[in-house]
């Protein structure tokens, strides 16, 4: 595994525990175990509960295994997409769980680890895969998709409403793109200088988000899992989802609202406290929604 020294700080840990309400003998499914921060906090808070942690990223799973090794009798980790969580639970002989946690953010390791391609801060290969066994990379997408399709992806997934076509055109003109800085250059050339100055975040943030979402099928996977999630919960079991942009949050909100088997616990998304944002600026865009499984609607 590559060198990595920066500590990942899990977002809204207090709120996660408050809404999940983990108890002894209960099973929590951590769908995005990442580096294990939330799972560790839950296991420390609740000495008798059990964690089933899953992630598609084999490298962060190794970090999680190290972080959770003292809880190895209560924490089981698996490399699998949360999209297939129902299959995993069936294989384990677990009919239903008592809590589901999803933290949809990119981990510090993915951002700061070498050669993952998620960052625009330094030169890396254009990868952006969370599952390193997947064949679709950002480089493949950027160099092979038609300009119109790239524009659609940047418009829809990056919410780049005004400049998606210009960015797509510059990407095509700059082909082949091989590194993250090649993509940054194309975006810089596409945007007017006043627009670059006006943006509060890095000017390439939206484009990187769009390509990452497309490469990893993030929205499709989220929709597919949330449709099944209510049937994986015992009555009284809770699902907690932390999202980091409006596309994800909208999917979570609408799924909870349309469900006949879930009672919404958060009418509005819960945001991190000012104190947490000061300590962990990446938490700023986090939005937490929670719901509880009810008997109504049947199985």
Curated annotation (Swiss-Prot):
S-adenosyl-L-methionine binds at residues 36-38, 55, 103, 110. It is found in: Cytoplasm. GO terms for cellular component: cytoplasm. Residues 268-299 are annotated as: Disordered. One of its GO terms (biological process) is rRNA base methylation. Its EC number is 2.1.1.199. Pfam families: Methyltransf_5 (PF01795). GO terms for molecular function: rRNA (cytosine-N4-)-methyltransferase activity. Gene3D superfamilies: Putative methyltransferase TM0872, insert domain, Vaccinia Virus protein VP39. InterPro entries: RsmH, SAM-dep_MeTrfase_MraW_recog, SAM-dependent_MTases_sf. It comes from the Bacteria. Keywords: Cytoplasm, Methyltransferase, rRNA processing, S-adenosyl-L-methionine, Transferase. The keyword Transferase applies. The keyword Cell cycle does not apply. Residues 268-282, 289-299 have a biased composition (Basic and acidic residues). It catalyses: cytidine(1402) in 16S rRNA + S-adenosyl-L-methionine = N(4)-methylcytidine(1402) in 16S rRNA + S-adenosyl-L-homocysteine + H(+). SUPFAM superfamilies: Putative methyltransferase TM0872, insert domain, S-adenosyl-L-methionine-dependent methyltransferases. Specifically methylates the N4 position of cytidine in position 1402 (C1402) of 16S rRNA. Belongs to the methyltransferase superfamily. RsmH family. HAMAP family: 16SrRNA_methyltr_H. This is Ribosomal RNA small subunit methyltransferase H.
């Amino acid at each position: 595994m590559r060198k990595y020294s920066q500590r990942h700080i899990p977002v809204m840990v207090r709120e996660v525990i408050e809404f999940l309400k983990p108890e002894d003998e209960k099973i929590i499914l951590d769908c995005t175990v990442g580096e294990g921060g939330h799972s560790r906090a839950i296991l420390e808070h609740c000495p008798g509960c059990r964690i089933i942690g899953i992630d598609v990223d084999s490298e962060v799973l190794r970090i999680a295994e190290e972080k959770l090794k003292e809880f190895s009798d209560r924490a089981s980790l698996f490399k699998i997409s949360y999209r297939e969580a129902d299959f995993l639970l069936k294989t384990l002989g677990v009919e239903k769980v008592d809590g589901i946690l999803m933290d949809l953010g990119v981990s510090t390791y993915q951002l700061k680890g070498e050669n993952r391609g998620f960052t625009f801060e330094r030169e890396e290969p254009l990868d952006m895969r969370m599952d390193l066994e997947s064949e679709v990379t950002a480089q493949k997408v950027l160099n092979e998709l038609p300009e119109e399709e790239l524009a659609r992806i940047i418009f829809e997934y990056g919410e780049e409403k005004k400049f998606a076509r210009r960015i797509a055109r510059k990407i095509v003109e700059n082909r082949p793109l091989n590194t993250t800085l090649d993509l940054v250059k194309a975006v810089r050339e596409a945007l007017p200088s006043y627009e670059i100055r006006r943006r509060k975040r890095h000017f390439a943030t939206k484009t990187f988000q769009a390509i990452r979402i497309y490469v990893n099928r993030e929205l499709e996977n989220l929709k597919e899992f949330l449709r099944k999630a209510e049937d994986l919960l015992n009555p009284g079991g809770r699902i907690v989802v932390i999202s980091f942009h409006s596309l994800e949050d909208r999917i979570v909100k609408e799924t909870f609202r349309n469900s006949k088997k879930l009672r919404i616990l958060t009418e509005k998304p819960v945001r991190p406290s000012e104190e947490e944002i000061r300590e962990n600026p990446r938490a700023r865009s986090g939005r937490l929604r929670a719901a509880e499984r009810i008997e109504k609607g049947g199985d």
